[in-house]
């Protein structure tokens, strides 16, 4: 009954408000592809020094959604297109609204999908520095998958950025089993999902400025702390 009520609430919210900001969608298209599969399509002979794995928000297009392309663009500017792979979470992660109401804020299949990408990155490119991110349901997904990772792989994730973190209250602004100083949570004032609700208000759709500046800056800083400034 509780799951049905929450799913109904999410559906009603979706009908009342857009699930993304049209300006952010336009910017994402202008920056380039909203789908990136560099890790999946790459091979071990062409590994990059940095691999960014990102989970989009509910109902967003591609596998990077509205915020991912901005972060990707900044990372490529910092490290060069030959220095970083960009990988969105697709496959079994459907980014459907109803999955927000599940206990971990997303589906078990989605968590396995993102776990598999981290594991693939570790196997294919064991010397790469990993960074991660997610928005809304994707933030919950990133947190859950990092929490569940083998510690040896989790230790390779230099930094993670979360926007509109739907498990922010429950996880006390952190990712369980992961260092707080490697985590940057962006929660706008008035974003109700950050305070334990699944109601989407306007501030939840306004993380574009963070994705263009503070978030990639945080990730770049964390990578350089590991690999140096080169």
Swiss-Prot record:
Temperature notes for this entry: Optimum temperature is below 30 degrees Celsius. Optimum temperature is 30-40 degrees Celsius.
E.C. number: 3.1.1.74
Activity sensitivity to pH: Optimum pH is 8.
Practical application: May have promising applications in chemical and textile industries as it is capable of hydrolyzing a variety of substrates including soluble esters and insoluble triglycerides. Can hydrolyze and thus modulate the surface properties of synthetic fibers such as the plastic poly(ethylene terephthalate) (PET), or the textile fibers polyamide 6,6, polyester and acrylic.
Propeptide feature: residues: 17-31
Regulation: Inhibited by n-undecyl phosphonate (C11Y4). Inhibited by paraoxon.
Predominant place of localization: secreted
Residue numbers carrying N-D-glucuronoyl glycine: 32
SUPFAM superfamilies with a match to the protein in the record: alpha/beta-Hydrolases
Disulfide bonds: 47-125, 187-194
Keywords: Disulfide bond, Glycoprotein, Hydrolase, Secreted, Serine esterase, Signal, Virulence
One example GO MF annotation: cutinase activity
Annotated protein name in UniProt: Cutinase 1
Source lineage: Eukaryota, Fungi, Dikarya, Ascomycota, Pezizomycotina
